[in-house]
Amino acid sequence: MFKRYQHIHFVGIGGIGMSGIAELLLNLGYRVSGSDLKETEITRRLSAMGAAVHLGHRAEHVLGADVVVLSSAISDDNPENRAAREMGKVPVIRRAEMLAELMRLKYSVLVAGAHGKTTTTSMVSTVLARGGLDPTVVIGGKLNAWGTNAKLGNGDFMVAEADESDGTFLLLPPTIAVVTNIDLEHLDFYRDLAHIQETFLQFINKIPFYGQAVLCLEDENIQSILPRVEKRFTTYGFSSQADFQARDVRTSGLFSSYRVHSHGDELGEIEIRIPGRHNVLNSLAAVAVARELDLDWANIQDGLRDMTGVQRRFQIKGEAANVLVIDDYGHHPSEIRAVLQTLADCYPDRRRIVVFQPHRYTRTRALMEQFARCFYHSDVLLVTEIYAASETPIPGVTGERLSQEIASHGHHDLHFCETVESALSRLVKLVKPGDAVITLGAGNIWQVGEWLLAKLKSSGGSGGTGELK
């Protein structure tokens, strides 16, 4: 690849996207170092693999590095970023540029979209692996079956998420480009929906003449750009107008099945062990990719049936005292609606308690109205203060303000809890046997579910009022 650059330093190495690239480079024999603000399961794993991981950001950490890779969360005044640039001869690049370099000698399957990227990437990866293509994979979440978010394969294909959040996905070279949906998101970078659509269109039109776009026809924002797509594309969805159609969708608990039709032919049945109509669409995207690559139908079926999910995507954390605890990464109104609909479909007889941690001030401000109307499938809602994710607070944009907006739109059992600790305290008093509790958000809200399970197990259950013994 780049033989002069043997020591690669990652600023923000603990991020899920950065860590996957770091793991691939370690497996390729490169010397990897990095820094992050705190020790996590991810940083411990990388350290065990041989990476030199530093806690905190200091200028001396970049000494000796041949190239420095920055997470999208790293600002210009970060001490390691500044030090590397002052050194002059050390390239300082963004994550997407390093990912693009890893893809340079591969055929790439890139999965883009506002929602569903991680699950769809995981499904495509699992199907390609089942089909014997042995892909190299970088996913934005830990695949349950593999225990990691990255895998170095020996095949000709690389499967990865294309993160649109800062526009750097335009640096990536797609051979096959999947777009799951386009939504109003990342308004700290994009001006408006038209800007987002235009950027996705540029991404799709980067496909070479021998490539293919795989586009979800259910999404209105994708439909509106189809006339301007210049490259070969196929569509998928529930509609009879889609090239790949999911028909006769059936759900049973956490399982879904459907029949695939394409261009007048019935291809067969697909079963997935991940609930939700949105995941039917995600799996259908994987079917379309696999058919483009001429994989056997049996391998497609087996690969999707074998797929057991991704951490933090409707992840069943456990059950204690007849209280079911689930965690999900959903932090956008569209994602929250889909997840809570799935929760209601899977557990119609349970009271549904949602613990939501808003993520980023800019997102909360831009989508306040949409957030106020996306929690109707919750019986009880706890909202914490906003998880900043390195952003500076915006006056008047708070978790309490969001709670007031949700209440004004008709939610009658809502509790504002300033911290995750206070959310746990309130939850302990509210929870009753038979409840389903789901934690939602891209920050550290998942801890509340784990703490709740530990308390329920240690206390031996809950009393009639819902209080722990």
UniProtKB/Swiss-Prot annotation:
It comes from the Bacteria. Pfam families: Mur_ligase, Mur_ligase_C, Mur_ligase_M. Its EC number is 6.3.2.8. The keyword Phosphoprotein does not apply. The keyword NAD does not apply. Pathway: Cell wall biogenesis; peptidoglycan biosynthesis. InterPro entries: Mur-like_cat_sf, Mur_ligase_C, Mur_ligase_C_dom_sf, Mur_ligase_cen, Mur_ligase_N, MurCDEF_pg_biosynth, UDP-N-AcMur_Ala_ligase_MurC. One of its GO terms (cellular component) is cytoplasm. GO terms for biological process: cell division; cell wall organization; peptidoglycan biosynthetic process; regulation of cell shape. Keywords: ATP-binding, Cell cycle, Cell division, Cell shape, Cell wall biogenesis/degradation, Cytoplasm, Ligase, Nucleotide-binding, Peptidoglycan synthesis. One of its GO terms (molecular function) is ATP binding. It is found in: Cytoplasm. Its main location: cytoplasm. It catalyses: UDP-N-acetyl-alpha-D-muramate + L-alanine + ATP = UDP-N-acetyl-alpha-D-muramoyl-L-alanine + ADP + phosphate + H(+). ATP binds at G113, A114, H115, G116, K117, T118, T119. Cell wall formation. HAMAP family: MurC. Belongs to the MurCDEF family. This is UDP-N-acetylmuramate--L-alanine ligase. It comes from Syntrophobacter fumaroxidans (strain DSM 10017 / MPOB). The gene is murC.
